[in-house]
From Swiss-Prot:
InterPro entries: Ribosomal_uS15, Ribosomal_uS15_bac-type, uS15_NS1_RNA-bd_sf. This is Small ribosomal subunit protein uS15. Keywords: Ribonucleoprotein, Ribosomal protein, RNA-binding, rRNA-binding. One of the primary rRNA binding proteins, it binds directly to 16S rRNA where it helps nucleate assembly of the platform of the 30S subunit by binding and bridging several RNA helices of the 16S rRNA. Forms an intersubunit bridge (bridge B4) with the 23S rRNA of the 50S subunit in the ribosome. The lineage of its organism: Bacteria, Pseudomonadati, Pseudomonadota, Gammaproteobacteria, Aeromonadales. It comes from Aeromonas hydrophila subsp. hydrophila (strain ATCC 7966 / DSM 30187 / BCRC 13018 / CCUG 14551 / JCM 1027 / KCTC 2358 / NCIMB 9240 / NCTC 8049). PANTHER family: RIBOSOMAL PROTEIN S15, BACTERIAL AND ORGANELLAR, SMALL RIBOSOMAL SUBUNIT PROTEIN US15M. Belongs to the universal ribosomal protein uS15 family. GO terms for biological process: translation. NCBIfam families: S15_bact.
Amino acid sequence: MSLNAEIKAQIVADNARCANDTGSPEVQVALLTAQINHLQGHFKEHSKDHHGRRGLLRMVSQRRKLLDYLKRKDVQRYAALIAKLGLRR
């Protein structure tokens, strides 16, 4: 159900602000988006997995909080991230 290490490393490399950046809001949102997209396929097959859906909703909520934080701190970085990931807003 989780992403493998190579995919995570690629996502971090694509969204990092500097060389060893793994904790910036951009990286965290990109990782959460990849996990959410991965889980959507799971729920198409397993529609009655309510326990897993709770985890998915928690991830969506965490992503929303990080996006709100980024929007408060730097609107330009927020807009660039939304465009890059193809999220609605």
